[in-house]
Amino acid sequence: MSASPSRSPESKPAGNTPPIDVDVENEQNVDAEEAVQPPTPGAGGDDADADDNDAKPAVDNEIDNDNTNLNENEGQNELNEDNLGDSDDESILSEVDEAQFEDFDPENVDIEDRPQLDIDEENLKLIGRHKRKRTEEEGTSKRKKEGRRRKSRRYAEEEEGGSDREAGGKRRKSKKAELEEDEETLDPATRRRRALDRAMDEALKKPTKRRARKQDGIDLEQMADAEIEDMRKRMTHAAQMDAINRREGKPAMHKLKMLPEVVSLLNRNQYVNSLVDPEINLLEAVKFFLEPLDDGSLPAYNIQRDLMTALGKLPINKETLIASGIGKVVVFYTRSKRPEPGIKRMAERLLAEWTRPILQRSDDYSKRVYQEAEFDPTYVLSPFLLKITSRVKSVQDSAAEARARELLPPRLANRARAEISHTSYTVVPKPTVVQESKFARPLGASGEDRFRKMRARQIAATKGQGARR
C-alpha cells in the first residue's frame, strides 16, 4: 500500500542533484541508526548539513514509497533492543566523548613488569592463597577502625532512661510515642485492629512460666491442702444429709449435686500427692459416696461410674487404703450381685491393681507362677470299675437322670460336643516333653532361616533399584 506523495508548491528538485536510487536503502538505514544514536561531536561540519538539506527534496518520493520497509526495519530494531535489555539512552557509554580517545596509544600504556614465574608444584600450591606483595611506595594500608556497634533496643532504652534520670538530659522520642501520636489521627476501626494485633503479639511473645511452689508470697501446696480439706468436709456433710433424707422418705440429691466438683478435683494432676495423702484422707469421703445407704440401697449409677473411673487414675498405696477404708467398699462391689456388670468389672480391676503390690505379684502374665501336679493314670477308672459304680447308684437317681434327659431339647445324637464348664483350672499339669540338648535347633528354625534369607534378598533388591535411580 503506497500513499501518493504530498509536496508543497515551494519545494522543487534541484537540477544538479546526483542520482541516488541505488543508495536509498542504505541512507534509510543510516537515518534509522542516527535516530537512535546521539550525534557525535566533531564528526561532521556545516557542509554535511548542507548536503543533507539539498538531498532531502530529491529523496522524498523514494522515502514515501518505502515507508513500509522502514517501519519493518524499525520494528525489528526495537525487538532486538528489547531482547538485549539495555537501551542506548540508559547506557553509560552513550555519554562518553569519543574525541578524547583519538590520541590513545595502547603500546605506550605503563604496565608494571613482573618476573615470570615457573610453573611447578610449589607455585601451584600458592594459587588462591597468597596475598599480593605491596611495594614500598604503596606502603601498608591502614585497617579501617570498626565503628561503634549498635546496642540492642532493650539495653539502649535502659541506658538512655538511666542517663536521663541522672543527668536530666532530653529524652529522644521513641517509636512508640510516634505511633501513639499517629494513632490519634486514625479512624476507630483502624485503631481497634491495631490494638488487636498488639494484644496477639504480646500473647505470642509471653514466655511460658514454670509452676512454682510459691507465687506472690502464697504457698500453693498449702492452698491445695486447704481446698482438699474443705471438699472433704462438704462431701461428708452431703453423705450425712442424703442418709437423713433417705430415712425420711425424701429424695437424696446432695451427692449428685456435688459429683461434678468432686470428679473435677480428683482429675487434677497437680493435686495427685495431696489427694492420696493419708493425713488429709479425702478418699474416706469418697468411700462415704460409694458405700450403700442405711436401707441397703446403692448410690446412683453416675456416682458409681464416675468415682470408680477417677479412682483408677490415682496412685493409691497401702497406707492410703488402711487410712481411708475404701478397699472394703470395692470388695463389696466385687462380691455383691446388685451392681451393674460394668461397675463390677471396674471394681475387680481396682481390687487387682491394689492387692498386687501388697501380695508382691507381678502384673506380667509371663512371670505368673502356677501350681503344678503330676498326672497319675492309676486314678482313671477302668471299664470294670465303672460298671460296679453304676450298679451302686440308686434307682431314684437313674430315674431322675432319665427324666432330665427327656426334657432336654431335641438334638443330634451322633454329634460330638464339648462340655462347657464355668470353672477355672488352678493346677497345671507338668509338661512331659522330652528335653533336647541345648545345641539342638528348635522346631521351626529352618522356616525362620528361609524367611530371613528371603527378607535379605528383598532389602538388597530395593537398595539396588535406589542406587540405579
Swiss-Prot record:
Asked if Transmembrane is a keyword of the record, the answer is no
Signal peptide (from-to): none
Please state where this protein is localized.
Nucleus
Keyword Cell cycle assigned to the entry: answer is: no
Give the superkingdom in one word. Eukaryota
In this chain, composition skew of type Low complexity spans 66-78
Q: What are the entry keywords?
A: Nucleus, Transcription, Transcription regulation
User: Could you tell me where the Basic residues compositional bias lies?
Assistant: 142-153
Which residue stretches belong to region Disordered? 1-193, 444-469
State one Pfam family annotation: Med26
Q: Assign the protein's first listed, main location to one coarse class.
A: nucleus
Q: Name one GO cellular component term.
A: nucleus
| GO process terms (BP) | poly(A)+ mRNA export from nucleus
Q: Which PROSITE patterns match?
A: TFIIS_N
State where composition is biased (Acidic residues).
22-34, 79-110
Ranges for domain TFIIS N-terminal: 284-361
Transmembrane regions: none
Which family, according to the similarity comment? Belongs to the IWS1 family.
Quote the PANTHER family the UniProt record gives.
PROTEIN IWS1 HOMOLOG
Summarizing the function annotation, the protein's role is: Transcription factor involved in RNA polymerase II transcription regulation. May function in both SPT15/TBP post-recruitment and recruitment steps of transcription.
What is the name listed in the Swiss-Prot or TrEMBL entry for this protein? Transcription factor iws1
Tell me what gene encodes this. iws1
